[in-house]
Curated annotation (Swiss-Prot):
Manganese found in the keyword field: yes
Keyword field: Carbohydrate metabolism, Hydrolase, Manganese
Protein name (Swiss-Prot/TrEMBL): Fructose-1,6-bisphosphatase class 3
Organism phylogeny: Bacteria, Pseudomonadati, Pseudomonadota, Gammaproteobacteria, Cellvibrionales
Any one GO BP annotation for this protein: gluconeogenesis
Amino acid sequence: MTSNALKVFISDLHGELDVFDFLADRQFGILHLLIRQQFSPELNETLCAAIEASAIRLCRAANASQAQLDRTSAVSKEILFTALFLMVVQQKAEDESLTIAIRRWGWLSTVHRALSGDAQLSCTPFSQLVEMLAQNIRTLSAQDFFALVQAFAKALFKKLSPELNIVGDIYDRGQDAFAIMERLRGLPNVAIQWGNHDVVWMGAASGNLACITVAVRICLRYGTLDMLHRDYGINLSRLERFAAKAYGDDDCAQFTPKGDLNAEEKLRIARMHKAISIIQFKLEGKLIARRPEYTMADRLLLDKINIANSTVTVGDAVHPLLDSNFPTLDVEQPYRLSEDERKVAEDLKQQFLASAKLTQHMDILFHRGGMQKKTGDWLLYHACVPVDEQGEFQPFALAPETTRGQSLFNFCELEMRRGYLNRMVINDRNESDIAWFLWCGPHSPLFGKARMTTFERYFVADKQTHKEGKNEYYNLRSNPEFLARVATELKCSSDQVRIVNGHVPVKYQSGERPVQANGKLFSIDGGFSMPYRSATGLAGFVLLEALGQIVLYRVIPNDKRYALEVEYQQILKPKAASVPAA
C-alpha cells in the first residue's frame, strides 16, 4: 500500500454494508468536502447537495448510464457539467480521455487554460468562463455530453481516490461482512488494523476450534447464517442434526436468536445456538488448560456448575442458573467433548479450512492488515495499548520473554501470521491460539477488558456478573502526556502524532465526544452497527485528512438514508520544506 495525501479512517463496520456504500459513493466524505470547499458560499447548500447527488448518481464509471443522463434536467446538467469541470481543473486531475476531449473542443481548452493561469486568458472574469461552459454544453449531443461527464468523473475520482484505513472490526453481527470484503478487494489502497472480531475469523480460518465455534455462535445469535452457508460455503447440517438430537426436548429460551423469524425457525436455530455454545465453552476450557500463560482460569465455569442445585459459582458467589439442561456435560470431565460434539467440531474445522472464499478474504486481512499502522502523522490501532492501574505498560508472559507495549504488538502479529501459514501443518504448537487470546484475553490489545462474560450473559441473571472491566488505558487516553508516552512506545517520534482508535462506541447522545486530548486522539466507533445506534445516536464517524484539512464527519441516520455533518475541522499548516544539507 502506498502513502497518499488523501487519508480516510473508519472503524467498526460490524458487517453493515449500507453505511459503507453510502460513504464509498462519496469517496468517504472527500467529494462532500471538495464541493463545499470550492463552491461555498458562491452556491448555497441546496445546490452543493444537488451537485454531489448528481456526481454520485451519474459519474461513477461503473454506474453511469446514458439512460440516467437523459432523465436529468437541463439545469442540473449545466450545474453538474460546470461543477465537475471546475473541480477537475482546480484539482489538476489528469486523464487521457479528458486530455483528448479538451483538445477536441476548443471552448473547453480556452476555459481550461484560463483557469490554469494562462497569461493571455487569466484576466477573463470567472463568471464569463462559467457562462461559456453553460452555453456550449447546450450545443452538445447527448452522446458527447455523456462522454465528457464520464471523462471528468473518471479523472476526478482517480485524483480523489484516498488511502482507506479501516481501524478494525469489519466482522461481527451484521450480515454483510462478506460483501464489504468483496468491495475492499476492488479498492487499490486499503489498510486494515485488526479488530478483535476480525481475529476471530482469522483464527477460524487458521483452524482454531475455539475461534471457529465463536464465529459460528455469533452467526447463529444474530441470524447471519447466509454469510456462513451461501457466501463461505459452511454447511451446518451436522450441527443441526446433533442439536435436534441432544436438545430436542429443550426450548433453549436463553439462546433465542435475534431477528425476525417464525417460531419454528427460532427454535431450530436456538437449539443449534445452545449446542455450539456448550461446545465453545468446552473447547475454550481445553485451550485455557494448555495456555496457563493466558491467566484465564476465572473463565473455567463448566466445572463450577452444580446440576443438582441448578447453580453455578462465579468468583466467590453462587448464582441460580437460568438454564440447567446440560445433556452432554460430564460432571467428572466437564470439558470433555462427547463423541457427537467432537464430530461437529471437526466437521466445522475441515469446512473452514477448505473454504476458498474465506481463505481469499483472510488473505486480504493478513496481507493488508496488522496490529497497528503509522501513516503520516497518524498512529492507528483498534482498541488500546494495555496499561496497569499505575499507567505503566502492562507486562504479558506470552512469549519466552515478557512482552509489553510494542513488543506485545509485535509478538501477537507474528504469532497470528505463523498460525495462518501453518494452518495445514499438524503440530502441537497451537500458534493460532493467539487469535482467541486477542479476541477475549484479559487486557488483550484488541479487547481491552479484564474478561469476556459470555457464559454469564447466557446463564446468570445477576448483571453484576456481566461486567467486563475496561483497561486503565481508557481512563488515561484523554491525557496528552499519556498519549505521548504511548506514541513513543509504538515508535512514533513526531510531536504532531494523532492516535486513532475504534472498538468502544462513542455514546454521543450521552455527551461523549470522539475527539480527546486536544485533538491528539480520535475515537471513531460511532455506531455503524445498528444495535449501537440507540447509544450513539449516529451511524458512524468518518475521519479525513484531505485538501489541507482534518475533518471528522458524523454519519447521521434517517430511516434508510444518511447525511454527513461536520463534528470537527482543523486547517493544517503547510509543512516547511526540508533543506538539503550543504
